Each structure stands twice: as structure tokens, then as C-alpha cells.
Regions:
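Histidine kinase transmitter module recognition
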Residues: 73-77, 108
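N-terminal interaction/assembly modules
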Residues: 1-73, 121-159
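Helix-turn-helix DNA-binding module
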Residues: 91-108
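A general secondary-structure boundary signal
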Residues: 20-24, 80-84, 98, 113
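DNA major-groove recognition helices of helix-turn-helix
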Residues: 109-127
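Polyanion-binding and phosphate-handling cores
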Residues: 64, 107-110
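Generic internal hydrophobic packing segments that stabilize the cores of diverse globular domains
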Residues: 67-71, 81-82, 95
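Short amphipathic alpha helix immediately N-terminal
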Residues: 76-93
Length: 159
């Protein structure tokens, strides 16, 4: 990967994936119930309802796969690196608190953070998820692209 922005994005959104997939379940249930109760209206023809449910189910599968991919990549990298990434991106701990908890000097922490992000990016690539693949795989998830754009903006400000 050219930069680690997808790695940062995937790690950051991980904490929301389970809740969103549960929300998708509720949407599927609501679609099914609405089609049952309002089957006489034109808006709820069987094909339209089926396509909507299939679309939601595919979205749920994609998000579950993203969650599993994230967890597998974290297992594949060094334990300390995984703890750094989980603390920073998933638990959103302040860097100084995380460095202290891990018994690292701040300078060492930031050096290790960069190494951890790079290791995670390489793990994503080993699973076949380059920048281009990640962009196409998550094409319909605008909220994830918003997070990605925020990391891109931060990178441009630092340059």
C-alpha cells in the first residue's frame, strides 16, 4: 500500500461494524414485514423487496468480512504492534496514556505506531487487499470513505 490510510480507516471503523450489521438485520426484518403487511401496494412488489433484502444482506456480508479481515490481520502482526493499533484506533486511547500503559517512551511509541501501521498494511496486502482492491470492495460504504478521506486530509496537512 502506498500509504497506511486504508489500514488506519479499517482499524478505526472496526468498532462500529458489529452495530451496523445488527442494524442491517433490523432493516431486513422491517423490509420483510412491510412487504407482508403492505403487499397490495405497487411499491412493494416481490422483486423490489427481494432485491432490497439481497442488497442489504450483501452489505452485511461485506462488513462482516471486513471485521474478520481486521481481526486476522491483527493476529498476524507482532503482539505489541497489535496492542498499539487496538489502543490507538479501536479503543481511541490518547497516545500518551497508551505509551505509558505499554511502558514505552513517547518517541518510541510513535516510531512503533508507524511500524505497526505498516505491518497491518502489509498484512492487508497478503490477504489480497491493496489500496485499489479496498476501494472497489468498499465502494458503496460512503461512511467508510468519509473516514478514509479524513485520514487523507490529515496526511496532506502534515506534508
Amino acid at each position: 500500500m502506498k500509504n497506511n490510510n486504508w489500514a488506519k480507516t479499517i482499524l478505526y471503523v472496526h468498532k462500529y461494524l458489529e452495530r451496523i450489521t445488527e442494524g442491517i438485520d433490523k432493516l431486513v426484518e422491517r423490509e420483510a414485514m412491510n412487504s407482508y403487511y403492505f403487499s397490495s401496494t405497487r411499491e412493494n412488489d416481490v422483486t423490489k423487496v427481494a432485491n432490497k433484502i439481497i442488497e442489504l444482506t450483501e452489505r452485511k456480508k461485506r462488513l462482516i468480512n471486513l471485521k474478520v479481515l481486521t481481526e486476522n490481520c491483527l493476529k498476524d502482526i507482532d503482539n505489541l504492534q497489535a496492542r498499539i493499533l487496538i489502543g490507538k484506533y479501536i479503543n481511541e486511547e490518547p497516545c500518551d496514556v497508551l505509551a505509558q500503559r505499554l511502558n514505552l517512551a513517547e518517541r518510541t511509541f510513535f516510531r512503533r505506531l508507524g511500524q505497526a501501521e505498516e505491518s497491518f498494511s502489509k498484512a492487508l496486502c497478503r490477504y489480497g487487499f491493496s489500496d485499489e482492491k479496498m476501494s472497489s470492495y468498499l465502494k458503496g460504504e460512503n461512511w467508510i470513505f468519509d473516514v478514509y478521506e479524513n485520514f487523507m486530509g490529515e496526511e496532506k496537512q502534515l506534508a
